[in-house]
Amino acid sequence: MSDSPIKYRLIKKEKHTGARLGEIITPHGTFPTPMFMPVGTQATVKTQSPEELKEMGSGIILSNTYHLWLRPGDELIARAGGLHKFMNWDQPILTDSGGFQVYSLADSRNITEEGVTFKNHLNGSKMLLSPEKAISIQNNLGSDIMMSFDECPQFYQPYDYVKKSIERTSRWAERGLKAHRRPHDQGLFGIVQGAGFEDLRRQSAHDLVSMDFSGYSIGGLAVGETHEEMNAVLDFTTQLLPENKPRYLMGVGAPDSLIDGVIRGVDMFDCVLPTRIARNGTCMTSQGRLVVKNAQFAEDFTPLDPECDCYTCNNYTRAYLRHLLKADETFGIRLTSYHNLYFLLNLMKQVRQAIMDDNLLEFRKYFVEKYGYNKSGRNF
């Protein structure tokens, strides 16, 4: 895919780490990296408008192939003019392959060489998602960046199982490349798997790099392993990927994990975390994790995060946010979701500046101490 519509441009490498500052050029515009991508599962980032996403600095969003295939259907979206037009988003979109949802949501799934048969979680009907079908759906959606179909083995599965799994994922990747109908306006990424086994990650990366994808995703992390185990896998995996292609760590959104991924050379991240925890009133702030629903904030008339200049923090108090959430008002979820997304996008902006200034390790130390990780024992 040497004439790929997705191009990575390296701007600067950080002197003391593997971090890199760059930009990714797509058919729907260019965005800076490292970048966090908000997740729009059902062709919407929950409770946020496209205008709000642009306002907070989101250069690209992610949407889910599995969910859009089942409802409203990829062919309907194609008739609407593609996903960009359907959801009124004129900037880059990345779609996943649907594989992770099949493994995590669907019932009675069965993995064969052909693909994965499963029960539709909406109506119980039996369906098959194959490498070719995953590509066909994404071709209909018209995303800028597509994912090849993979199996995501659990981190602690036995070596022999993971070995068979990555070999099948490589065969599926090759089939997906052959099925790709729109290589000139949609980039396709391969997904490196291998659980925690260095030799299997190496084999997976070698297979996929030889196929010359537009970029490479690192899958099978943030699925229950420790933070240290994830960092150890990233330490060797990013080294196996080409310098002239984007690197994407899937499903990671905790602030310290984002910084640690960047330190190891990752360019792109996505996660439902900021919006999911916002719906329960959990907010990421410059002083750490804050559950604004808690009784201690009932008469707290200060901003959610005094150091944040997002719409929520500029206009509303902790007491008001608590009231909205306790009263089950959607506006409360909109405001906490906006803040959490803004917080992570702004964190990545600070990370990009730290790479420019060659002080990313100092920034990490300052951020982690201030966020209070060691006090709470939690990573968000």
Curated annotation (Swiss-Prot):
Region (RNA binding): 251-257, 275-279
Cellular component per GO, a single term: cytosol
Cofactor, how bound (note): Binds 1 zinc ion per subunit.
InterPro entries for the chain: ArchSynthase1/Queuine_TRR (IPR050076), TGT (IPR004803), TGT-like_sf (IPR036511), tRNA_ribo_trans-like (IPR002616)
Subunit and interaction comment: Homodimer. Within each dimer, one monomer is responsible for RNA recognition and catalysis, while the other monomer binds to the replacement base PreQ1.
Sequence similarity: Belongs to the queuine tRNA-ribosyltransferase family.
HAMAP family attached to this UniProt entry: Q_tRNA_Tgt
Record protein name field: Queuine tRNA-ribosyltransferase
Name of the coding gene: tgt
